[in-house]
From Swiss-Prot:
Family: Belongs to the UbiA prenyltransferase family. Protoheme IX farnesyltransferase subfamily.
Gene: cyoE2
InterPro entries: Protohaem_IX_farnesylTrfase, UbiA_prenyltransferase, UbiA_prenylTrfase_CS, UbiA_sf
Bilayer disposition of the protein: Multi-pass membrane protein
UniProt protein name: Protoheme IX farnesyltransferase 2
Length: 295
């Protein structure tokens, strides 16, 4: 049991991805007026809650992880940290994260963190991941909470921009997750996890991927059409979304589904990273918003 093991079970890669989206939502709402204390609270608080969820997920998934090539060497599977210690660790992380959001940002930010946590740990990890083909859809809501937390930490209200972020990031999760399930197909099959590609076949999953990316593309453009983001954001969102859609379409002619799915997965990360960056720098200032609505 070492510091390295405690870091590993929080899934740092997932935390990093979520932190980027928190920043995107935060700067979109800040419109150039940054409160450093709230920014740090949103970033650190969300990171702690996400880390807590990941540790709880590791605790819950020990039996599944043992059956999957990708996860069979995880810390808890190998017994490098005891279950009891991991549960206490996860609880401390979660409480600390929610408290930081509640007291330094605002209760609304803390509420969305709790909602995301409950969906991920309670609904997805404990039950739906193992029992339902719709587990990915429900789980996608938890993955969409970080940008919303970042946004409401500043705005202290759930407005159209926050709703758009929720829809955008939920829709993004679906093709992203299905791509993983395709190139890790044998792992999911071995662990009897009823993800769409395993349960209904890869061809059906390809159709769903195409439709979700199309819906995602439309949702991303709404930030500009609703007056929250600028034209540079729109250009990047349209270009990235359309190319991702094209990549999905090529899946119907793919010679190797594993190679295709891995490329789709990698580009999904580039896409959501680019959009998080663009909404951070190409927001509409309050005066610009007034002009937008005046017209």
């Amino acid at each position: 049991m070492s510091l390295k093991h405690f870091i590993q079970i929080t899934k740092p890669g997932i935390i990093f991805g979520n932190v980027l989206s928190v920043a995107g939502g935060f700067f979109l709402a800040s419109k150039g007026h940054v409160d450093l204390a709230i920014f740090l609270a949103a970033m650190i608080g969300t990171s702690l809650v996400v880390a807590s969820g990941c540790v709880f997920n590791n605790c819950i998934d020990r039996d599944i992880d043992l059956k999957m090539e990708r996860t069979k060497n995880r810390v808890l599977v190998q017994g490098l940290i005891s279950l009891e210690v991991a549960l206490v660790y996860a609880s401390i992380l979660g409480v600390a994260g929610v408290a930081l959001l509640y007291y330094v940002a605002n209760p609304l930010a803390a509420l969305f963190a709790v909602i995301g946590f409950v969906i991920y740990v309670g609904f997805y990890s404990l039950y739906l991941k193992r029992k339902s083909v719709h587990g990915t859809l429900v789980g996608s809501l938890s993955g969409a909470m970080p940008p919303v937390i970042g946004y409401v930490a500043v705005s202290n209200s759930f407005d159209m921009a926050a709703l758009t972020l929720l829809v955008m990031f939920s829709l993004w999760q679906m093709p992203h997750s299905y791509a993983i399930a395709i190139f890790r197909f044998n792992d999911y099959l071995a662990a009897s996890i009823p993800v769409l590609p395993v349960k209904r076949g890869i061809r059906v999953a390809k159709k769903h991927i195409l439709l979700y990316i199309l819906a995602f593309l439309v949702a991303t453009l709404m930030l500009t059409f609703s007056g929250y983001a600028g034209m540079s954001y729109l250009a990047v969102a349209a270009a990235m979304g359309m190319y991702w859609l094209y990549m999905a379409w090529t899946g119907y002619k793919a010679v190797d589904d594993t190679v295709w799915a891995r490329k789709l997965f990698v580009f999904s990360i580039f896409t959501i990273t680019a959009l998080s960056v663009m909404m951070s720098v190409d927001f509409k200032a309050p005066t610009e918003l007034l002009l937008t609505y005046a017209h």
